[in-house]
Amino acid sequence: MFLGLIPIPTPISLGIQNGSVEDCFPFKRSNLIRYQIKNMNKTICNNSPPIISPFTSIIHFTLLFTTSNSPSQSFFDTIEKNESRKGIYMKLISWNIDSLNAALTSDSARAQLSQAVLQTLVGLDADIIAIQETKLSANGPTKKHLKVLDELFPHYETTWRSSIEPARKGYAGTMFLYKENLSPKITFPEIGAPSTMDAEGRIITLEFEKFFVTQVYTPNAGDGLKRLEERQIWDKKYADYLTALDIEKPVLATGDYNVAHNEIDLAHPSSNRRSPGFTDEERSGFTNLLNRGFTDTFRYIHGDIPNVYSWWAQRSKTSKINNSGWRIDYWLTSNRIADKVTKSEMIDSGTRQDHTPIVLEIEL
């Protein structure tokens, strides 16, 4: 079939599964408009609506060809050539769960809200899920925890890091769930942080062939800012750590950073100038981190959109109803791959207060 002779819209089918195709038709003389397909999140720039086949690995869409702009090489040869150089599409989620044990084993009203959020995450089918504030014992998840996780997320591997002595027991802690087809090298870095911070299970890093995925649960400055000086040291050490990773290969960094970077990132900036998470010192620390070569992907995608937050205080029963929130959870990337991000946003967690999950979609 010589498609260049067809002057009317012609349906073409491509088999695409868990991947991305971008600029598959780079004909210099063609009037084809650039398009992207992102793992079933489709943007067809010629406004031809995609039709989802009953076979989900196939997407039908319409392309326009004219005689004057016919390609000089085989249409399907071009597809094959460009398919061979497409990137790696990934969906990643991060969530401060505020007690994994409660979310997995309790039947309290709050636990039921957490379980509903977990079901939402199940449906999103992420490649990697980062979890902060697991609050597990030094021995990590129990057999019961692992059983429930396996029921929720079959075909995922689990790695975790708990708070250990001399740090407090059942405090902080992080965990990754990642699909079993992935084979990262896992490290549990210590960054030379003050006090017991390095023993509190705050960082896990996954190393892949071409990039790092790392998560953090940044220490809170504490009531009365009693930990603010230590927090400032932490911020510098953490920035040094991410920079060292970035020298090797691009970085995707996520977690609860316990800081609202700018006034737009919380509902009531004027009354929180000396509140933990919005002090000048903490904000400056985050600015320094970004200045070391990292991008806040939410702002990169959404610009200065206001009133979008990732955390609402549990102490106030109306904080979420009134949207009196803070944006303190982030997906960061190395600057040089920020343009690969296609989505960075919050995931709806219903009426549950505290943190809501955040999602990143990227083609590396």
Model-identified regions with their sequence ranges:
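N-terminal, active-site-proximal structural segment of metallo-dependent hydrolase catalytic domains
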Residues: 36, 75-150, 160, 166-171
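Active-site beta-strand/loop signature of hydrolases that rely on acidic residues for catalysis
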Residues: 95-96, 121-141, 213, 241-263, ...
